[in-house]
Amino acid sequence: MPYNCCLPAMSCRTSCSSRPCVPPSCHGCTLPGACNIPANVGNCNWFCEGSFNGNEKETMQFLNDRLASYMEKVRQLERENAELECRIQERNQQQDPLVCPAYQAYFRTIEELQQKILCGKSENARLVVQIDNAKLASDDFRTKYETELSLRQLVEADINSLRRILDELTLCKSDLEAQVESLKEELLCLKQNHEQEVNTLRCQLGDRLNVEVDAAPTVDLNRVLNETRCQYEALVETNRREVEEWYTTQTEELNKQVVSSSEQLQSCQAEIIELRRTVNALEIELQAQHELRNSLENTLTESEARYSSQLSQVQCLITNVESQLGEIRADLERQNQEYQVLLDIRSRLECEINTYRGLLESEDCKLPCNPCATTNACDKPIGPCVPNPCVTRPRCGPCNTFVR
């Protein structure tokens, strides 16, 4: 607030009436809060009739200088106070449009990053579900593979047993062929023996016939031989047919077994080929699923690292903004404290100025109206002032002329 109307602008004249005379005995005490200003100015009997004392002039000059310096300091403090109030108003006006948009931008960035993090989490969840599905599919394929492998092992065991049976049948066939050969050889031996016996019998019968021609009637040996030959031939034919029928039956059975075994072998081989193809396809698909899982895990790791770095950057940005906000708040607190200090200084200066005003007004009322008069100081006009105050003059009362 301005103080131009509160105190008079003091100036000292060159005459004797421009300065009050303060005796040395009046400097004993000072006013509280008024730096070394005499408190008993005008209360002691220091009126003179002619001239002023040099100490009184110096005291008035000191008071005028102090008052001028205080007024200048008050004006400077008023200017600084006005500047601080303008700065505070500008800061209060600029605080909302400056801080809020910045925080809104940060909030938008944080929301975008949160949306990205949520999208990344959903993508990670989807990838985890896909990985679980791939694991379930791989487990299913592994179960199928183990089942097919067990079936393959069973089929291979059956094929091995059928191969053993085929080997046994081959051995039986070779044994039967050997038996047929031996029977053929035996048949040839029997034929040879039969021929030898027939020849022997013929020889014997021929001798007997010659002997018995004279003794007995003749016997038809050809018929007997033919009958014997027919009997043996019928027996040989019967044995041959039985052997041929048995051989044919065994051969047909073996052929049937071989055909069925070959069909089973072909079907087993086809199944084995199909199982091998299925196993290869499953292995390829399993390898693809493993590669997909590895790629998804790598993508997940990269996403986590990227989002963690972005989150750390956002945290650093938030920390910086919070530190700036703390600095701004500390600056505002410091300015408020300075403002309070200035207000306290202002109040003290106002008290001191009021003290000066009261002191000057009281002294103005106590000084005589005509310090140069010898009889009545208040009724007669003021005399002319001496141009040279240092010249010795008659002693008179103090001059109470102030220029407002």
From Swiss-Prot:
Highest taxon, organism lineage: Eukaryota
Stutter (site feature) positions: A305
IF rod domain residues: 56-367
Region spans: Coil 1A: 57-91
Assigned GO CC terms: intermediate filament
Region (Tail): 364-404
Region (Coil 2): 220-363
Record carries keyword Coiled coil: yes
Protein's name in the database: Keratin, type I cuticular Ha3-I
Gene name of the encoded protein: Krt33a
InterPro entries with a match to the protein in the record: IF_conserved, IF_rod_dom, Keratin_I
Protein family (similarity comment): Belongs to the intermediate filament family.
Region span, Linker 12: 204-219
Residue segments, region Head: 1-56
Keywords for this protein: Coiled coil, Intermediate filament, Keratin
Segments for region (Linker 1): 92-102
Record-linked PANTHER family: INTERMEDIATE FILAMENT (PTHR23239), KERATIN, TYPE I CUTICULAR HA1 (PTHR23239:SF97)
Chain segments carrying region Coil 1B: 103-203
Pfam families for this protein: Filament
Any further remark recorded for this protein: There are two types of hair/microfibrillar keratin, I (acidic) and II (neutral to basic).
MF (Gene Ontology): structural molecule activity
